[in-house]
């Protein structure tokens, strides 16, 4: 995951996302529980962060967590232990993914493709590591088509991009998923009523290799 890593912002974001954990669960929890309801025993997560998704995985799940921000790692380890997951932490990025070809049944990520340096390359890596029939499940904030949110996204893009280590408020992720070569892509448009206006427009996607 090639993003603009900065030790100060990395530490600050690790602290912030830990503080916002309950808030994010309130905003995304129902959706995540639905999408992650029937995951296999081993799950690969890109951008596992501070472990916000650990609560949605079954106890005993083997979680292969890709997370380059070392300041997130203590929170991630604590969350995995709290929810009784077998954590395998890979402190690397997603391009390339540190996994063998056709080795994963499921890859998940939430609010990550907005931040990666080259989402096309990351999606290519996801397809590479998925087995035939394997699924990529993601929730991402995306560019609004028009209106107030689109205007706010354009207005705040530069400071948001700087503070959140490369996050794009207006990335056309749905289009990128459709062009990534998956056999099937199912996208659901969602509006999340969050106080963070630039990221209210979302998609939830299931992509099958």
Task: Enumerate the predicted regions with their spans.
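N-terminal, positively charged/glycine-rich alpha-helical extensions of SAM-dependent methyltransferases
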Residues: 1-15, 29
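C-terminal alpha-helical "lid/dimerization" subdomain adjacent to the S-adenosyl-L-methionine
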Residues: 4, 17-25, 139-199
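Conserved alpha-helix/loop element of class I SAM-dependent methyltransferases that forms part
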Residues: 19-42, 52-56
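Class I SAM-dependent methyltransferase SAM/SAH-binding core
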Residues: 44, 49-96
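A short acidic, Gly/Pro-enriched loop at the edge of an enzyme's catalytic core
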Residues: 95-107
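A short SAM/SAH-binding and catalytic strip from SAM-dependent methyltransferases
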Residues: 105-118
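A short glycine-rich, Lys/Arg-flanked "PGG" loop and its adjoining helix->strand segment in the class I
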Residues: 120-132
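C-terminal lobe and adjacent flexible extensions of AdoMet/dcAdoMet transferase-like proteins
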Residues: 202-209
């Amino acid at each position: 995951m090639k993003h603009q890593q900065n030790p100060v912002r990395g530490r600050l974001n690790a602290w912030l996302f830990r503080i916002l954990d309950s808030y994010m669960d309130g905003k995304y929890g129902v959706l995540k529980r639905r999408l992650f309801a029937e995951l296999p025993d081993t799950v690969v997560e890109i951008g596992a962060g501070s472990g916000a998704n650990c609560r949605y995985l079954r106890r005993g799940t083997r979680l292969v967590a890709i997370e380059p921000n070392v300041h997130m790692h203590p929170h991630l380890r604590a969350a995995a232990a709290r929810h009784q997951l077998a954590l395998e932490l890979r402190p690397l990025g997603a391009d390339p993914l540190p996994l063998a070809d056709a080795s994963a049944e499921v890859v998940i990520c939430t609010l990550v493709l907005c931040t990666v340096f080259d989402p096309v390359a990351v999606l290519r890596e996801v397809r590479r590591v998925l087995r035939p029939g394997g699924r990529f499940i993601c929730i991402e904030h995306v560019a609004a088509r028009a209106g107030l949110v689109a205007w706010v996204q354009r207005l705040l893009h530069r400071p948001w991009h700087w503070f959140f280590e490369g996050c794009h408020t207006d990335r056309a992720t749905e289009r990128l998923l459709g062009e990534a070569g998956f056999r099937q892509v199912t996208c659901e448009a969602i509006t999340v009523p969050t106080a963070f206006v630039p990221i209210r427009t979302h998609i939830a996607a299931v992509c099958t290799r």
